[in-house]
């Protein structure tokens, strides 16, 4: 007889009887046991133990937030984010603003020392995004590098504009622009070093009296445009001490480190010009779309010239291109630019710009580079025009009345940084560290210009380069970062105007196409290498939003196909206030490595 109630059906399914329910229960239990065994077997293959296996296990320690934090802090509006990677600290933040529409938001970040048998102890409080005028509540993300536990980096995303009246009065950014705020803050040390003790003796009673290594703050702000770059902390922070910032116009690699005067172990992190020896030349093989392109750990040989079998552009296309190029040429000469015949020769290579002078203009409308130029070794060595490198040393002023040195000129390329200590004193930037005494903070910036790279790749490596007219928009997604070889693989989605293939019938008018360019950028040399160039896909009736949406989905699929398991400790710890913006709260703050929960 069939069970008459849900409880009877459940009990029948879970019993060991010989009925169908009992057999089904055995099969289900067997499947569950088999699944766990398969997962554990996979550990031997991948070398990584997935924490998902133990998510339903009770934590070793489970405490309530109300029992370890005074109510005054909760009433003050503390939003608790999570545990640090080391498990020693719990982080929270507060945001405050006035009652009127013209007041700014002010953010503070807090470190609380966690102890199972006592209440949380506040050990550090810092103000984020120093002196920035923030008119709306931010999405915050606090991140830690895989192995660098000396500092955290905080991103603030302004995803919606202020109200219309304030925008009109203050001339703020419109819906096509978003502000990104970044603060890098030193983590409180577990104990006081000798330099911290000296600072405490110099400023008795001041909890913010710390040495520079354990007490610096670095702030910057930049603006991104549509299509707004994807936030990818797992890739942007994959290399310790380095953060990759996509500013919509360039990719900026920033390295932050603290050193002492006379430190012989100083090592430049970026752009140290270290390269591996050249590999023997080999003919290129077709790349399967299912396999990830190998990140070049060496400088490959020059790319072959375009085959003679490629279709030649029709006379109408050539005439139209020459007309456009002539207009640009005349405008350049009218402004006192360099004439066409005075330009230096290009060096052969996939990017064709290793020995390019900074002042050389970009190729226009599909101009091709001369393939009979002299070898790169014979050309004068100069930095590629698509790369900018700066290194500044920040030091604390020695006295209150010290006259600052000459102001450093803004190169309009590097991101501006404000560096302070915990007591709010600004650090002065210097280009040379010869006169530095005591501790100093080094900020390196290596910048890759997207538009220059796009023009170079199309000019030298695109089989459809003879059809190209201009590009209208682009979107950059990081596909992989190799911290050992310092290679960054990026995918450039491109909306462009190009003439149709000569084989197509109809009028010779430019059409809108979409394509993608994969490029590997070397953080040691600043040089990029073209990995692959996609075919042209005509955009028919699609909005730019749908084009970028499908492009980013394809990037996600590509990354998931290439995903390689890493050591459980080599991850970027990420804490956000996303739940707050969704109108809800986290249930627990979990330290999965130590099986500790704080119930909210």
Curated annotation (Swiss-Prot):
One Gene Ontology MF term: metal ion binding
Compositionally biased spans, kind Pro residues: 280-295
Keywords: Immunity, Metal-binding, Phosphoprotein, Ubl conjugation pathway, Zinc
Compositional bias ranges of the Gly residues kind: 13-27
GO cellular component labels: Cul4-RING E3 ubiquitin ligase complex
Impact after mutating residue 90 to D: Abolished interaction with DDB1, DDA1 and RBM39 in presence of indisulam
Positions bound to E7820: 231, 234-235
Name of the protein: DDB1- and CUL4-associated factor 15
InterPro entries: DCAF15, DCAF15_C, DCAF15_WD40
Consequence of changing residue 232 to R: Decreased interaction with RBM39 in presence of indisulam, without affecting interaction with DDA1 and DDB1
Record note on what altering residue 244 to P does: Decreased interaction with DDB1, DDA1 and RBM39 in presence of indisulam
Inhibition and activation profile: Aryl sulfonamide anticancer drugs change the substrate specificity of DCAF15 by acting as a molecular glue that promotes binding between DCAF15 and weak affinity interactors, such as RBM39.
Consequence of changing residue 444 to K: Decreased interaction with DDA1 and RBM39 in presence of indisulam
Subunit record text: Component of the DCX(DCAF15) complex, also named CLR4(DCAF15) complex, composed of DCAF15, DDB1, cullin-4 (CUL4A or CUL4B), DDA1 and RBX1.
Binding of Zn(2+), residues: 193, 196, 211, 214
Sequence segments annotated as region (Disordered): 1-30, 280-316
Domain of life: Eukaryota
Record CDD domains: DCAF15-CTD (cd20913), DCAF15-NTD (cd20917)
Species per Swiss-Prot/TrEMBL record: Homo sapiens
Function: Substrate-recognition component of the DCX(DCAF15) complex, a cullin-4-RING E3 ubiquitin-protein ligase complex that mediates ubiquitination and degradation of target proteins. The DCX(DCAF15) complex acts as a regulator of the natural killer (NK) cells effector functions, possibly by mediating ubiquitination and degradation of cohesin subunits SMC1A and SMC3. May play a role in the activation of antigen-presenting cells (APC) and their interaction with NK cells.
Phosphoserine modification, residue list: 50, 310, 314
GO biological process: immune system process; protein polyubiquitination; protein ubiquitination; regulation of natural killer cell activation
KW Metal-binding (keyword) present: yes
């Amino acid at each position: 007889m069939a069970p008459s109630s849900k409880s009877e059906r459940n009990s029948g399914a879970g019993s060991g009887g010989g009925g169908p329910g009992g057999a089904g229960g055995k099969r289900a239990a067997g499947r569950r046991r088999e699944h766990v065994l398969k997962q554990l077997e996979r550990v031997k293959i991948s070398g990584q133990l997935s924490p998902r296996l133990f998510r339903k296990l009770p934590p070793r320690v489970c405490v309530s937030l109300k029992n370890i934090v005074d109510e005054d802090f909760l009433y003050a509006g503390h939003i608790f984010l999570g545990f640090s990677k080391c498990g020693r600290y719990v982080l929270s933040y507060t945001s405050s603003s006035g009652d009127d529409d013209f007041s700014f938001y002010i953010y503070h970040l807090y470190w609380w020392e966690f102890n199972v048998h006592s209440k949380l102890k506040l050990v550090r409080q810092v103000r984020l995004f120093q002196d920035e005028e923030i008119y709306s509540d931010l999405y915050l993300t606090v991140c830690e590098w895989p192995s660098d536990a000396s500092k955290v980096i905080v991103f603030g995303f302004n995803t919606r504009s202020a109200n219309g009246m304030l925008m009109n009065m203050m001339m703020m950014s419109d819906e096509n622009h978003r502000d990104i705020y970044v603060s890098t803050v030193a983590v409180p040390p577990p104990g006081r070093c000798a330099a911290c003790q000296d600072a405490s003796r110099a400023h008795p009673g001041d909890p913010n009296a710390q040495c520079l290594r354990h007490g610096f703050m670095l702030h910057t702000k930049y603006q991104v445009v549509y299509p707004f770059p994807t936030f990818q902390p797992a890739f942007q922070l994959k290399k310790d001490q380095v953060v990759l910032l996509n500013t919509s116009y360039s990719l900026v690699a920033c390295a932050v480190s603290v050193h002492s005067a006379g430190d012989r172990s100083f090592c430049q992190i970026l752009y140290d010009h270290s390269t591996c020896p050249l590999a023997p030349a080999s003919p290129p093989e077709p790349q399967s779309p299912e396999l990830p392109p190998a990140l070049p750990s060496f400088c490959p040989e020059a790319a072959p010239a375009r085959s003679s079998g490629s279709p030649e552009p029709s006379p109408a296309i050539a005439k139209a291109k020459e007309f456009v190029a002539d207009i640009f040429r005349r405008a350049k000469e009218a402004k006192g630019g360099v004439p066409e015949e005075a330009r230096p020769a290009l060096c052969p290579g996939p990017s064709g710009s290793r020995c390019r002078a900074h002042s050389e203009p970009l190729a226009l409308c599909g101009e091709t580079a001369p393939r009979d130029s002299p070898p790169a070794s014979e050309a004068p060595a100069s930095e590629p025009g698509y790369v900018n490198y700066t290194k500044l040393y920040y030091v604390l002023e020695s006295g209150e009345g010290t006259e600052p040195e000459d102001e450093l000129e803004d190169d309009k390329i590097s991101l501006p940084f404000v560096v302070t200590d915990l007591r709010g004193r600004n650090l002065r930037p210097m280009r040379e560290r010869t006169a530095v005494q005591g501790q100093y903070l080094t900020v390196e910036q290596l910048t890759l210009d997207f538009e220059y790279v796009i023009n170079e790749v199309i000019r030298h490596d695109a089989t459809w380069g003879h059809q190209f007219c201009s590009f209208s928009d682009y979107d950059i997604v990081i596909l992989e970062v190799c911290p050992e070889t310092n290679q960054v693989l990026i995918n450039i989605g491109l909306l462009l105007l190009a003439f149709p293939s000569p084989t197509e019938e109809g009028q010779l008018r430019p059409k809108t196409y979409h394509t993608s360019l994969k490029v590997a950028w070397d953080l040691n040399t600043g040089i990029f290498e073209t990995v692959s160039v996609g075919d042209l896909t005509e955009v028919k009736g699609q909005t730019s939003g749908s084009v970028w949406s499908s492009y980013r989905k394809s990037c996600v699929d590509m990354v998931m196909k290439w995903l390689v398991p890493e050591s459980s400790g080599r991850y970027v710890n990420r804490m956000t206030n996303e739940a707050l913006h969704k109108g809800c709260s986290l249930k627990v703050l979990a330290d999965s490595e130590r099986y500790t929960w704080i119930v909210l």
